Swiss-Prot record:
Species annotation: Ruegeria pomeroyi (strain ATCC 700808 / DSM 15171 / DSS-3)
Keyword annotations of the record: Cell inner membrane, Cell membrane, Membrane
Xref: SMART domains: Haemolytic
Membrane-crossing residue ranges in chain numbering: none
Identification of the protein by name: Putative membrane protein insertion efficiency factor
């Protein structure tokens, strides 16, 4: 995990430690939104991981869907094309 991703993971870890036991475990998805956020930060880094986490949290509401929603695997970046010949 990048240093910035570690910093962005701190509020998620604090939520899991402090607030989650009080509000209950009511996430509509598997993995939970906080687990999804931590995994997204781990796999994708700070920018893309936080974007994926924000999108997921935005989908988690009573009128939204539910079920299994894993973090997508990172796409391999292709090297730039070199001129032929």
């Amino acid at each position: 995990m990048t240093p910035l991703a570690h910093i962005l993971a701190l509020p998620v870890r604090a939520y899991r430690l402090i607030f989650s036991p009080w509000v209950g475990f009511n996430c509509r998805y598997q993995p939970t939104c906080s687990a999804y956020a931590l995994e997204a930060l781990e796999k994708h880094g700070a920018l893309r991981g936080s974007w994926l986490a924000a999108r997921r949290i935005g989908r988690c509401h009573p009128l939204g869907s539910d079920g299994y929603d894993p973090v997508p695997e990172p796409k391999d970046r292709k090297p730039p094309h070199s001129p032929a010949g």
